[in-house]
Each structure stands twice: as C-alpha cells, then as structure tokens.
Amino acid sequence: MPAVALGVSVGWRSLSLWLLALLQLCSADLDVLSPGSGSDKFKVEGRAVVPGVRPQDWVNTARVLVDGEEHVGFLRTDGSFVVHDVPSGSYVVEVISPAHRFEPVRVDITSKGKMRARYVNHIKTSEVVRLPYPLQMKSSGPPSYFIKRETWGWTDFLMNPMVMMMVLPLLIFVLLPKVVNTSDPEMRREMEQSMNMLNTNPELPDVSEFMTRLFTSKSSSKSSGSGKAGKSVGKRR
C-alpha cells in the first residue's frame, strides 16, 4: 500500500509539471500575439497646420484616425500628434475636424520600421507621389457640408427647351427670307416643299401658303418701290 500511494503521488506531480509547462507555453504565445507587446509596433508622427488659425483654437475638436478608427490619436497644443502601437503595413492617416478639411495621406510601414508617406490617389492607385515624413498635413479649407442653392439667370430662361422651340422657328421665318434669294422660283419651291414636310399636322395652316404670301409681298413691295422711283424720275424730266 505505501508503494502504491508513493507511485500515485509521483504520477500526480509529473502530471502537474506537464500542465504548468503547457500553461507557460500558452501564456508565451498569447504575449506574442497581444497587440500591446512585441517589438513590431511602431508610431506614426506628424503635424497638422491650419493657415491663419492658432492650433489652440481647433485641436480640441480634432482627431487623428489611422486605418479608419483602428488607431486613434489626439493632437497636442502645437498641432503635432503621435499614434502609438501601429503594426507594419499600409494605412491611411486622416485628420478629422468639424471646422477644417485635411487631405488623407497613406503611410507605408515596413517590418523594419521604415516609413514612407505618399498621396492618396483613388483614381491612379499605381501612381506614387512621395511626401515628407514626419507628416506635414495642411488644411485645404473649411468642409463643404451644404450645396449652394442655384440662382435664376437669363441663360436658364433662354436655354429652356420650350422657349427654344418657340424662338427658333420664329427666327427661321424672319431671317431665312433675308438670307436666301427669294426671287429664284426654284429656291422658293424647294423651301415650300421642305416646310410642308415638317408640317405633319393637318390642323395647322399650310406653310407653303405662308411662305408664298411672305415672298410675294416682299417682291411686290420692291416692284412698287421701283415703279414709284421711275415715275418720280420721269416727272423730273
């Protein structure tokens, strides 16, 4: 019996030792995977500037976002910022302020801690425009939360489709006889045919009659004017 008890105690001790060793290994793995430990964590540094405005007037309401809200930083009273515990990778750094707009910057961090800053180009993603590091982020103006209401102008009235449909035919009727040689009967006949082709509604007046009256009235006025001039010349003689 004492030998059996001694063997059982030795077995329990060895089992407990194995369990302790296993727990130590698991805790070591958790320490390596934990976000706050390890030497592969870096910091993103920079400065935000608003031209003509003191940093004390706006830094209290601003935040620095790295990769969305994955890492959040705050600005000091001089406009500088440091975001700690950022692993290696490629991140978009933004300064968010309700009163000022800042362009985002992409920061690439290598596994050895080398930093590279460049413009964020959503159209040409392969184009790389280097920026200095630590970051120097300058405000581009106030954010545009609202769209300016459009004002009414004369161009809006003139470019209205209904107005153009009313004005253009009138201009054609008035200016076309002055440009085209109306004394030519063939030209007049072609114009009447083309206008009749456009007039598809039978309830509307005949365009050819209108054109004939217009041209004949002009030609008769010209002939009467020339006749009167000839009579006046004859009387003078």
Curated annotation (Swiss-Prot):
Residues 29-156 are lumenal. Disulfide bonds: none annotated. The keyword Transmembrane helix applies. Residues 216-237 are annotated as: Disordered. GO terms for biological process: protein insertion into ER membrane by stop-transfer membrane-anchor sequence; tail-anchored membrane protein insertion into ER membrane. Residues 1-28 form the signal peptide. Its main location: endoplasmic reticulum. Keywords: Endoplasmic reticulum, Membrane, Signal, Transmembrane, Transmembrane helix. Residues 178-237 are cytoplasmic. GO terms for cellular component: EMC complex; endoplasmic reticulum membrane; membrane. It is found in: Endoplasmic reticulum membrane. It is a single-pass type I membrane protein. Residues 217-237 have a biased composition (Low complexity). Belongs to the EMC7 family. Part of the endoplasmic reticulum membrane protein complex (EMC) that enables the energy-independent insertion into endoplasmic reticulum membranes of newly synthesized membrane proteins. Preferentially accommodates proteins with transmembrane domains that are weakly hydrophobic or contain destabilizing features such as charged and aromatic residues. Involved in the cotranslational insertion of multi-pass membrane proteins in which stop-transfer membrane-anchor sequences become ER membrane spanning helices. Component of the ER membrane protein complex (EMC). This is Endoplasmic reticulum membrane protein complex subunit 7. It comes from Xenopus tropicalis.
